[in-house]
Every structure is written in structure tokens, then in C-alpha cells.
Amino acid sequence: MLQYPHINPVALQLGPIKIHWYGLMYLLGIFAGWYLTRYRAKVKPWAPIKPEQVGDLTFYVALGVILGGRIGYIIFYNLPYYFHNPSQMFFLWDGGMSFHGGFIGVLIAFALFARKIGANFFDLGEFIAPVIPIGLGAGRIGNFINGELWGKVTDSPLGMVFPTGGPLPRYPSQLFEFFFEGVVLFSVLWLVTIKKRPRYLVLGLFMFLYGCARFICEFFRQPDPQYGYIFFNWMTMGQILSIPMILLGAVILIAVFIKTRKNKCENI
């Protein structure tokens, strides 16, 4: 059995002001995304934005992630609770962010920013997709430090006892998601971007691979108590929300494949 490290969720306290690791992980993901996006804007001839525009894009994306992630969590996962406790909506440091809500928020941010600078929405998505897993991975580390979103009870050597998860060992599902949705997904997408490839291949891969990784990791994660299993006595809300991403990613990949076969797909 693994030992849970018991990290204080508060990284730094300055008088009454508490700086939480959860928030720092989001800041780390946003900063890393800004840095790599700026680098890509300098070296990629087809980049839909200029390096000096990356700061503004990062601001739009950060708002989309935070607002979309929080609103998505409230709507998708715990609406009755927040309806009766509206002040809790603003306590982001306690956790409670939805990737799928954040993804919708980012899509809206992309649409607004693309319209502002006159860029193509899908080109912008293709350009940003390789750096998104960094933020996903950082967020999962924040979940792990918070001791939330732990996995199912297990007798596996990978199990650990979480402070809020009862006395039995559980899968560290946050670390599984960090590895597959963060490390593996980033590595795959970044390697694909090194060489020329069909336009929108990376966008399709991101949506398809993330959806598959999340769907599989949900089998190790404890279902949300307010929902449990929604369909077939095994399907969770996270899996339901991942299915549209898998399907849309598959559609994009099939379209790219067909255009490539017909020599109608531009390589970038």
C-alpha cells in the first residue's frame, strides 16, 4: 500500500490571506501554457496568432477555464447543493471544478478571441491543443493535494488511505488522470506537432484521446456521491460527458483521414 503524503492544502499564509496549492497548480498550468504557446507562435509559420497576442489569449482562456470549470461543476455535479448554499459557489480554493465545463468555457473564449483578432476558430484550437494537457495535469495534482476525487476502495498495492476517504485504501485516481490526461497526452500531442501533419489532426487527437483517457480513468474513480452510477450500474457523469468529446474527436480524425486520402488536406 502506498502512503498518502499529507501535504497541507495551504501553501502559504500571509496573515488572513491563504494561498492554496490548488490555486497555485492552476496558475502553474496557465503560466506553462502561456510560455509554450508563445514559443510556438514564434516558431510555427502557420500560427494563427502573433507572439504579442498570446498574453491576451491566455487571459481569455484563463477566464474560460475558471468560470466554465466552476459553473460546469455546479450545473453538472452539484446544482441542488449550491442552490441551497449560493455563497459556496465562490469558494474555488475548496475544489470543485469540472473539466468539461472548463472545456466549454475555453471554446467560448476561443470564439470570442478569434473574432476579435480575425483568426479561424479551428486553427486556434489546433494551435492550442498540444499545451492543454499541462493544465489538466496540474489540476489533477491540485486535486491530489486537496485529498479530493479519490478512487474506489482497493486491495491493490497502488491503494492509499486518503484523509477524507475513510479507513480503507483507495486508488489514487487523481494521479492516474495526471499521468494519462497530463503526461501521456501532452507527450503524444507534442511529438505529433514536431513534424508536418494534416491540419486539425492534433485537435482531433486531443479530443479523442482525452475523452478515452477520462472514460477509462473513471472506472478507478469513486463516483460522485450525489449521482453514483447513472446508467447500467457502472456509467458515471464523467463518462457521459466524455462521450461527446470522443465522438467529435473521431469525426474530426475521420474527416482529416478522408481529406488526406483525396489530397485535399493541407499539411502544417
Curated annotation (Swiss-Prot):
InterPro entries found in the cross-reference section:
Lgt (IPR001640)
Q: What GO MF terms are annotated?
A: phosphatidylglycerol-prolipoprotein diacylglyceryl transferase activity
Question: Might you give the EC number(s) for this enzyme?
Answer: 2.5.1.145
Q: What is its main location?
A: membrane
Q: Where in the cell is it found?
A: Cell inner membrane
**Per UniProt, what is the membrane topology?**
Multi-pass membrane protein
What PROSITE patterns does the record tag this protein with? LGT
Tell me which UniProt keywords the record has, alphabetically: Cell inner membrane, Cell membrane, Membrane, Transferase, Transmembrane, Transmembrane helix
Q: Which GO terms describe its cellular component?
A: plasma membrane
The UniProt family comment states: Belongs to the Lgt family.
Name the job this protein performs.
Catalyzes the transfer of the diacylglyceryl group from phosphatidylglycerol to the sulfhydryl group of the N-terminal cysteine of a prolipoprotein, the first step in the formation of mature lipoproteins.
Q: Known HAMAP family for this protein?
A: Lgt
The protein in question is named: Phosphatidylglycerol--prolipoprotein diacylglyceryl transferase
Which source organism?
A: Francisella tularensis subsp. mediasiatica (strain FSC147)
